[in-house]
Structures are given as structure tokens and as C-alpha cells.
């Protein structure tokens, strides 16, 4: 498991010529599609072995392919390591870009009811959630 994205469902398919890896990162963004997709495309230029993509519903995946001849223990380890690294390091950024309004609403709802906000603390600064009343309730 990662530190930000605790689970990353991953499908590995073996065909006659390749090993394909597809890992679910997050559902279709609620907003800021252009900003979210632009960030993903720019990030693709810097990534090793996998790239961001979308399914027919707009959900975000990491996908990679190895030729069957490269599907050694080391090759599989590298591609799965890339999936873990990029899913984990990209998760909060994708949430900030594509779900900011929902996160703000959830924060306000929890603060108003005295509910724990500890799993939203990563978004305090980037989304401007640092209201003094709200930060007093961070658990």
C-alpha cells in the first residue's frame, strides 16, 4: 500500500506477445477536466513504464505494457513499482484538481458536526481549508 492511496487495484494480463498492467487510480473527476487531464499528460512525459489514461467512463488509470521477452521478475517488479509510486504520488494532486468542491463541502460538513477531519488534512493548504475554526478540529 501507498501512503496517500492506500490500495491500488491492478489487473495484469498476459497475451502472446506482451504483459499488460492496468491500475485504477481514481474515478472520473467532478470538475476541472482540462486542468486534471493537462496535469496527467504533462506527468506522462516524466514517467517510467506506465502512463495515465482514461476508460470509457472517464475513470483514471495507469497503464503499461512489457514485451513478453522483458517480462522477467525484474521487469514485472519495475512496472509494478512504477504503478505504486505514480498512483501514490499522484493521488492527492488528482483529488485537488478534480474534486476540490467536493473536498471543501466534506470539510465544512465534518467541521460543522465535529466529525474527524484527519484524512483531509493533506488538502488544508492547497484548497485553502485553513480556517482557524476548522483547524482546531483536526484530529
Question: Model segments located where?
Answer:
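Short low-complexity stretches enriched in small and charged residues
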Residues: 15-22, 37-39, 118-123
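N-terminal catalytic cores of peptidoglycan-degrading enzymes
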Residues: 1-31
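Short, highly charged C-terminal tails/helix-capping segments
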Residues: 95-138
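Short amphipathic alpha-helical segments
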Residues: 29-36, 75, 79-82, 86
